[in-house]
């Protein structure tokens, strides 16, 4: 479901005893996650580690069909080609998501007046073959969202309905299980690129507008 207000609990800094217990529990868990040695996102080590585990982003294939199960088996059995993830194909959905993920994160931080911390690929504390790479976790102790995870999808063409696709819902469940946290916000954004300055100026839509610079290694 889509909710206009994502705050589902009271301020964790409330003097209420139970809320303080919850705050301490979340704070302790975040310290545990921060202490885990993790490869940097999208580094060679990060891709290698992800390939050696079932991650939150692909584990949904187990539940879809026999075909998708075989797809997952093939992905894990074939040799890993890291270069395919580093190709500067600016038209691919993968590149689109990587390009606009920081912008989506800043938007989330802006509307919620908080800060999101990035994590790498986190292994499950008990089942080492399961891992998750959250797009971020709110680690600001003064925020009402303290301890909440964030999953971002940057839509290329499809319409945003406010209802997460099943594979995204499964992905968030696995992320919360791996990180031992109880909440995850799902943020879908859709960006429109203007081909020239004139189109940008003449656009009369009421959507948020702005410009940013992106540097690509050739």
Language model features: what each stretch is:
Residues 94-116:
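Acidic-basic catalytic patches of nuclease active cores, encompassing PD-(D/E)XK
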Residues 1-99, 193-195, 200, 206-218:
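Charged, glycine-rich intrinsically disordered N-terminal tails and low-complexity linkers that flank
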Residues 110-134, 138-218:
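Nucleic-acid nuclease catalytic cores
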Residues 63, 90, 106, 112-113, ...:
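Homeobox/homeodomain signature
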């Amino acid at each position: 479901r889509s909710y206009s207000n994502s705050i589902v609990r009271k301020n964790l800094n409330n003097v209420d005893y139970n809320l303080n217990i919850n705050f301490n529990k979340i704070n302790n868990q975040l310290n545990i996650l921060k202490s885990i040695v993790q490869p940097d996102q999208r580094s060679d080590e990060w891709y290698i580690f992800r390939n050696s585990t079932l991650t939150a982003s692909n584990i949904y294939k187990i539940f879809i069909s026999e075909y998708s199960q075989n797809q997952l088996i093939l992905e894990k059995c074939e040799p890993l080609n890291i270069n395919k993830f580093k190709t500067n194909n600016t038209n691919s959905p993968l590149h689109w998501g990587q390009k606009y993920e920081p912008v989506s994160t800043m938007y989330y931080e802006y509307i919620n007046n908080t800060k999101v911390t990035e994590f790498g690929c986190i292994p499950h504390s008990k089942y080492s073959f399961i891992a998750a790479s959250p797009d971020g976790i709110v680690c600001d102790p003064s925020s009402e969202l303290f301890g909440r995870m964030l999953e971002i999808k940057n839509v290329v063409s499809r319409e945003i309905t406010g209802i997460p696709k099943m594979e995204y819902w499964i992905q968030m469940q696995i992320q919360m299980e791996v990180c031992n946290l109880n909440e995850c916000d799902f943020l879908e954004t859709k960006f429109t690129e203007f081909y020239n300055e004139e189109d940008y100026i003449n656009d009369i839509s009421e959507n948020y507008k702005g410009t940013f610079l992106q540097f690509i290694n050739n």
